[in-house]
Amino acid sequence: MGIIEKMRLDGKKGFVTGGARGIGKCTATAFAEAGADVAIVDIDFEEAQKTAREIAEKTGRKVIAIKTDCTDKDQVDAMVKQVAAELGGLNFCHNNAGICINAPAEEMTYEQWNKVININLNGIFLTDIAAGKYMLENGGGSIINTASMSAHIVNVPQPQCAYNASKAAVIQLTKSLAVEWAKRGVRVNSISPGYIGTELTLNSPTLVPLIEKWNHMSPLGRMGKPEELEAICVYLAGDTSTFTTGSDFI
């Protein structure tokens, strides 16, 4: 079997949180193109349904939509059970839901801080644990968490201390779970994208003025494209990465 065949995800089942648009939509599409059945998990159910239909029509795979608030433990636990029941199992997941609030630290409210931490860190913890428990009891699997380059550096010129802190914590959570579960068949890795030109970013009145500055600081002189994250996620979800855990891909 050649490397391209080994990279395929035929027979695998997985879900993507924040999967209705942006990075999550691209990776969900890639998983399905590689042969997996996928659940689009998002708090925006209407958009998740639209994305699920598009991917199913494009790939011929079974793609479902599930409305979930990833900060609600009961909803997350129910989502994992629904994925396993409707798709026939759970082999991988991409925990991608997240937000960013730009505000100077001294002006950021405690409510704003908590909102970012709750979605970006607590939401990934809840999803990791729910998916991890299923995988530990059912032969293993692969968990992919979306962190950020902001876990490694301080972005400028925009102030975003809560986002930076939350994403740094995601990487350490990823490593901790990877060590705990390594000998039990569950791998946990993270990706740390740079500036990615998602539809929301490219159409944001507050972010568009910053794009030229970001591009100037990038060695490639441009933002990344969401689809440029597809290959690493397909690799991590599949069986060619079985010796890879606790790693962060920047």
Give residue ranges: language-model regions.
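Active-site helix of classical SDR
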Residues: 128, 166, 174
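Substrate-binding pocket helix/loop in short-chain dehydrogenase/reductase
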Residues: 104-105, 109-117, 159, 214
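Canonical Rossmann dinucleotide-binding motif of NAD(H)/NADP(H)-dependent dehydrogenases/reductases
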Residues: 9-38
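C-terminal substrate-recognition "lid" of short-chain dehydrogenase/reductases
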Residues: 222-250
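Residue(s) in the substrate-gating loop at a strand-loop-helix junction
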Residues: 148
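The beta1-alpha1 cofactor-binding region of Rossmann-like NAD(H)/NADP(H)-dependent oxidoreductases
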Residues: 45-46, 67-78, 110, 227-228
